[in-house]
Amino acid sequence: PNKSTLFPDGMPYYYVRGEGPSIYERLYARLAELKVNAVDLRAELEGSRDTYFLRDSHWNEEGSLVAYGAIRGGLGYPEARDWGTADDILVHTGDLDAMLHPLTAEPEALPHRTTLDAYAIANDAQGVEDAYVVTAAAGNPDGQTLLMYRDSFANNLLPAFASTYRSAVFTKNVPYNLGDEQVGFAQDVVIERAERHIASFATDPPYMYAPERTIVSEGREEGSVAVMRVRDADPYIVIEGSLDRDLKKGERVYVEVAGDAGEVQAYEAFRVSEPRVSSSDFEGQGASAQQASVIKDDRGFRAFVPKGHGGMVALGQIRLFVGTEQSCREIATEAVV
């Protein structure tokens, strides 16, 4: 959670919370509706100011261990590991302090448990802030394996997980590559994302094969126009673009692709929104700004489909549909870029 979500009384007087549910609350309501295994850390962290740095937007070691215990519980492990009490002091310069006082920032004392140092970095990463970190814990030869998609909030979270798992991979790269062989390698997969980055779920959907669907077409929707682009992104073909209208509740977007042998398969596309800021919004790990050229407002779509035997699929072999699997309508695809 954002620091301001947990401690709104610490915000300036002119900071006024908006009406209605927050994006955080809407996300967790939707995850519950879809029965996604999600851990809401807000209840775990609320009320304890000792869990976040004073002059930093992130949680400190205390907060990270609260999060660690809750996440491990969400993974089905009955008891969180006891890391003991702090027996060392580190120093940390907060991101807020560095922004507000670049010349006079004051490092904060960070009580540290050396029991969290029971791991080694197994790749060429220099530390927990690197975008891709592989770890090994020699004390856990029969332990589990972990893949964590994460952001900077996991800088303090990484040591506890790295010390718990025999082997672990921590990556900041987005979009998430859910087709990566590492997903199969890991016994546990965790997605940690800061509240302030929730919106990028809508702008950077993960790399993964679009789910196959069997659709029933009810004909053509007259007057509807779509802009579509097809590009190669090995091992995928990416079909993306924008609709000229909002989808009604329950409607989805499908792309139908004819293969080299004449076979036809429909896939469900991700709904995608246009990034509101630059592609470096997600801590410098964002995807190319090129995506925004055909994704407009919140009417975008993107599907990663398998390549045909001949490589790129010809443009004439693709049709776009909106609706549901049981009843959808083809929309015009003449405007192809």
Label every PLM stretch briefly.
Residues P1-V337:
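Extracellular glycan-modifying ectodomains
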